[in-house]
């Protein structure tokens, strides 16, 4: 018998690194059995993109009011119908719980961390685009509640590119 982490590590050694592997109960489903997830969205605000991180961050060379973004993020914490924050129209349920949104900045690097029960199609990227619009002053802090009330995607911000988004942790 080959340890699962070793066998998979041999196949994917250039793309991923396996730190641990565990046996799971019958019926386990990696996505459907999850009780929560944490995503991190990485931004680079420098005038020119960092050559070492440009493939893994969204280059957004604008001044951001991180305090305004944090205030807006607090309005999104809780259990809501997030229909206005998804691009998929036929979701069975759009009710999700966001436990935390943390926005950290150091120099020209900014990271936005999202923790919740789960996220809809494009939800984290739309939330990020909305918070960036708050940060640039293009929208008010209070406006982040409009897509929750109206369930209208057009009331939310732009779809941030996938390039800066990482699934950091899955909770079971």
Model-derived features with residue positions:
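Ordered, amphipathic secondary-structure segments that act as subunit-interaction surfaces
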Residues: 10-43, 47-52
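Core RNA-modification/binding signature centered on pseudouridine synthases
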Residues: 6, 26, 61-172
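Single conserved hydrophobic/aromatic residue that forms the stacking wall/gate
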Residues: 1-12
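Acyl-group handling in specialized metabolite and lipid biosynthesis
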Residues: 53-60
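Intrinsically disordered, low-complexity sequence elements enriched in Ser/Thr/Gly/Pro
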Residues: 4, 29, 52-53, 123
């Amino acid at each position: 018998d080959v340890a699962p982490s070793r066998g998979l590590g041999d196949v994917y050694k250039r793309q991923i690194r396996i730190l641990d592997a565990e046996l799971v109960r019958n019926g386990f489903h990696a996505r459907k059995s999850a009780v929560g997830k944490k995503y991190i969205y990485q931004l680079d605000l420098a005038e020119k993109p960092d050559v070492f991180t440009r493939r893994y961050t969204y280059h957004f060379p604008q001044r951001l009011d991180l305090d305004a973004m944090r205030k807006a993020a607090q309005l999104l914490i809780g259990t809501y119908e997030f229909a206005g924050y998804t691009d998929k129209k036929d979701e069975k349920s759009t009710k999700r719980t966001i436990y935390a949104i943390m926005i950290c900045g150091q120099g020209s690097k900014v990271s936005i961390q999202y923790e919740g029960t789960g996220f809809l199609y494009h939800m984290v990227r739309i939330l990020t685009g909305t918070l960036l619009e708050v940060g640039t002053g293009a929208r008010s802090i209070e406006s982040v509640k409009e897509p929750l009330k109206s369930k209208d995607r057009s009331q939310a911000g732009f779809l941030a590119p996938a390039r800066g988004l990482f699934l950091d942790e899955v909770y079971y």
